[in-house]
Amino acid sequence: MEKTKLTGRIVTRDDPDYNEARTNINLSLERYPDIIVFCQNKQDALNALKWARENRVPFRIRGGRHSYENFSLLNNGLVIDLSEMKKITVNQDKKLAYIEAGAELGEVYRTLWQYGLTLPAGTIANVGLTGLTLGGGIGLLTRAAGLTCDSLVQLEMIVADEKEGADLITVSCSNHPDLFWASQGGGGGNFGIVTSMTFKAVPISQVSIFSITWGWDDFEEVYNTWQNWAPYTDDRLTSSIEFWPKEVNRIEALGQFVGPKTELKKLLKPLLKAGSPTSGMVKTTPFIEAVTFFNSPGGNQPQKMKRSGSFIEKPLSERAISTIKHFLEHAPNQNASVWQQALGGAAGRVAPDQTAFYYRDAIIAQEYLTNWTSPGEKRQNVRWIEGLRTSLSKETMGDYVNWPDIEIRNWPRTYYGENVERLRRVKTTYDPENVFRFEQSIPPLRRSLFF
């Protein structure tokens, strides 16, 4: 039988654009693959998987380059990159959007906006929609319209066959329903190569947005007020809040309300009464302008970084709030922060076992962030993140799989909760030989949970 050849745009170590081609969002975890294939279509992806299997070459799958632990890269081996497959097709009457695997959020938002539609997705413009969806997908429409994966109706996926080949299958709630379930929060890269997704989009036009800032002295009052307000207010309002180190002297709450400014102002009264706000803004704007407002330029830039996170099921105690404050008083640099987003609403009306995204009962998703410039700073930054995570563990649970943390020992249960065994059964059905694997990929049942 004739051997498969790689097709698509192929970059190797000798190419002048190799360094750009291999670079992911996290510069503290350098990886040097031998070959990067930028797939132009589904056939390129099929050929890449077949070639890797025939030649016994390890590989990784990459989309938006936003894997915090660089799980989409490897040393030596092959990277199968989908980022140049970006076609978006919209059926306005049925409100369906067919989106290829390489499309980024900014492009998706802009295209759907032309039809008066959108998806409940994230805020950073160059995050890949596919990876976001496979991990669940939170953003500033979460409480109004659910997680990104809740809007998924179908996907195309390349899976490994029993020999050395690859098959393209269509996955939905009626076709391979177990794999469809796993694709709604089970994380990327575990079961196959997603080449496209189809979503049920939601109508959107004007939204109202807000920003409120405070100084450090209001830390406890603002934290406590926000956590007891944001997850329980009107479902049409989704908000986030970020706390920076003491010397930065800044706390900022942001949010988006699918409704008029007059209603939003009423809803914000409890938050505005907290402490002494240093600035405030409330306005109504076209949704696409809100997308630009919430896009974080810093989140788009490759940098040396460490991330982790957790979920909160009930408001944190004064002791836990003091712990967060203490860590921010002793942060490794001024770029460190603790960021939270309110959950509940539409996302919380889905049962924990209805999709692979387990943490439906959480009221808050909490992310721990830091980045630095000198390689010598890595250790203290990682220790700060892990110390914060461990210190809060008695009052938090799990971690969002899209905020992976290589330091977490029991990562399968941390990411997937009670859904982990079902995910392993799905893995065993579709990838019993563990062809699709990386440092924290779901293992099939016949393999150790920690491998």
Curated annotation (Swiss-Prot):
Pfam families: BBE (PF08031), FAD_binding_4 (PF01565)
Class of this enzyme: oxidoreductase
TM spans (from-to): none
Required cofactor names: FAD
GO MF annotations in UniProt: FAD binding; oxidoreductase activity
Pros-8alpha-FAD histidine modified-residue sites: 66
PANTHER family: BINDING OXIDOREDUCTASE, PUTATIVE (AFU_ORTHOLOGUE AFUA_1G17690)-RELATED (PTHR42973), FAD-BINDING PCMH-TYPE DOMAIN-CONTAINING PROTEIN (PTHR42973:SF39)
Protein name, as recorded: Uncharacterized FAD-linked oxidoreductase YgaK
Recorded name of the encoding gene: ygaK
